[in-house]
Every structure is written in structure tokens, then in C-alpha cells.
């Protein structure tokens, strides 16, 4: 059996043994040492997130492919999801796109609740930091997920950046009755970054295959290109 086929079979078997577990029992990946230029820049340009209301970010998957069961939208917006004792996670994926470089960062929240009982289990949000080069990079634009589309900031206001780190806010939109991301001048917190190509095979397979209901994983293979097209700033 060829190595690639063996790895694929092994990942599939691992996923069979994976489970949906309580949202506060998912152990995040530690941020690994970068080994590529894209990974290095992804760490250098990692954004921060300010939670205006709602859940704080949680890890969605562990190294064995176990995924978060999320939370029902009950109680207050942040009931049961004010932070994991194991620590949180930010996910990333980077690619050359339309002559620039797209660095997508994504957070998972166990629920998206605008009012008590109104909302849905699971929430995935993403922002894209657009760099003009890999050698002497500058942030040329920011994009922040707004339901199924993106708010774009081209060029971004200097108040939206803390050095290389974009400042992103997670808050409620009373127009679409969902949470969204937007650029902000308010500083936030950072989480350990794990890139798509740094995940275990079991974790990648779980993110590809798990049904997160009304939320979808923006950086998985099935969604990544479409999300980037929606987020592109011109």
C-alpha cells in the first residue's frame, strides 16, 4: 500500500473512533513552531478578537478528531461559554490569491445567540488579512465575516491595527439577528494558532465531515475558495 493511501485510510479509521464531546472538554492544539514562510507570517499577523457580547472562542476539534457538541441557545448570550479551561484556539489557512496573499483566520463559538432562546448551536466566524508580498509585507485590506458575506476594509484604518495584528470585534447584528465580525479600534485577546496544514489528519477530516448545523467551517476544502472570493476586497 502506498504511503499516501495508508495515511488516508489511517485518518479515516481515526475519524470513525472520534466522537462529539462537550464543548468545554475539547483540548486545543498548542501553537507549533512555524516551518514555512506562510506559517511564519500567519503567526506574525495573527489577529486579536474583542468579544463585545456572546460566546468566547473555543477549540472545535482535538488532535484525535473529537469535535465540539456546542451549546443550545439558552440563557444569556454568553451563558456556558465564557472561556474554556483548556484554552482557546484560532485556526488559519493561507494562500496566494489574485496577486496578493490571503491569510484566513477563524474562530469557533459553541453557540450563536442574539436573544434568550433565539439563535443556533455552533458559530464559525472568519477574517482575512490581505498582504501584498511575502518579503516585505504590508496589510492592504481586512475582511470580516458578516453572516454569509464579508465586510471589507480597503485600506484598513490605522486604528484597526495593533502593529501587525488586526483588531476584530465579535458582536450582535440586530439586522440579521446573528453575530458577526467587524474591524474595531478596541484591543482584544489572541489565541494559539493552528494552521490547516499543521492539523492532524484526524482533525482535518473531522472538520471536513462534521455537520455544524447552521454554521460552516470557512477554511475547509469544501468552502475555502468560495469564502475567499466572497471576502476579496476589490
UniProtKB/Swiss-Prot annotation:
Transmembrane segments: none
UniProt signal peptide: 1-18
Name of the protein in question: NLP effector protein 1
Motif (Conserved undecapeptide motif I): 102-112
Keyword Glycoprotein: yes
Family: Belongs to the Necrosis inducing protein (NPP1) family.
Main location: secreted
Keyword list, A-Z: Glycoprotein, Secreted, Signal, Virulence
Designated gene of the protein: NLP1
Organism of derivation: Phytophthora capsici
Glycosylated residues, chain numbering: 66
Domain statement: Key residues/motif important for the effector activities are degenerated in most NLPs, including the nlp24 peptide consisting of the conserved region I (11-aa immunogenic part) and conserved region II (the heptapeptide GHRHDWE motif) that is important for phytotoxic activity.
One of the record's GO cellular component terms: extracellular region
Induction: Expression reached the highest levels at 3 days after inoculation of pepper leaves, followed by a gradual decline.
Sequence motif Hepta-peptide GHRHDWE motif II, residues: 119-125
Purpose: Secreted effector that contributes to virulence during infection by P.capsici. Induces distinct chlorosis at 3 days after inoculation of host C.annuum leaves, and all the chlorotic areas gradually turn brown and become moderately necrotic at 7 days after inoculation. Leads only to chlorotic areas, without necrosis at 7 days after non-host N.benthamiana leaves infection. Induces cell death in hot pepper.
Subcellular location(s) per record: Secreted
Amino acid at each position: 500500500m502506498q504511503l499516501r493511501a495508508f495515511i488516508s485510510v489511517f485518518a479515516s479509521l481515526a475519524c470513525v473512533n472520534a466522537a462529539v464531546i462537550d464543548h468545554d472538554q475539547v483540548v486545543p492544539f498548542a501553537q507549533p513552531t512555524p516551518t514555512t514562510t506562510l506559517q511564519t507570517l500567519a503567526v506574525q499577523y495573527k489577529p486579536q478578537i474583542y468579544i463585545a457580547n456572546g460566546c468566547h472562542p473555543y477549540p472545535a476539534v482535538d488532535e484525535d478528531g473529537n469535535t465540539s457538541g456546542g451549546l443550545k441557545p439558552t440563557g444569556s448570550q454568553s451563558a456556558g461559554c465564557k472561556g474554556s479551561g483548556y484554552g482557546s484556539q484560532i485556526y488559519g489557512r493561507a494562500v496566494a490569491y489574485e496577486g496578493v496573499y490571503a491569510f484566513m483566520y477563524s474562530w469557533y463559538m459553541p453557540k450563536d445567540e442574539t436573544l434568550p432562546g433565539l439563535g443556533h448551536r455552533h458559530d464559525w466566524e472568519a477574517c482575512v488579512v490581505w498582504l501584498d508580498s511575502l518579503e516585505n509585507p504590508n496589510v492592504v485590506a481586512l475582511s470580516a465575516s458578516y453572516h454569509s458575506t464579508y465586510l471589507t476594509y480597503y485600506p484598513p484604518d490605522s486604528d484597526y491595527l495593533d502593529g501587525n495584528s488586526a483588531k476584530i470585534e465579535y458582536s450582535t447584528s440586530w439586522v440579521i439577528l446573528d453575530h458577526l465580525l467587524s474591524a474595531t479600534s478596541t484591543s482584544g485577546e489572541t489565541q494559539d494558532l493552528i494552521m490547516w496544514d499543521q492539523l492532524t489528519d484526524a482533525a482535518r477530516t473531522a472538520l471536513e465531515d462534521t455537520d455544524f448545523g447552521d454554521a460552516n467551517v470557512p477554511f475547509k476544502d469544501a468552502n475555502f475558495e468560495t469564502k475567499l472570493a466572497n471576502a476579496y476586497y476589490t
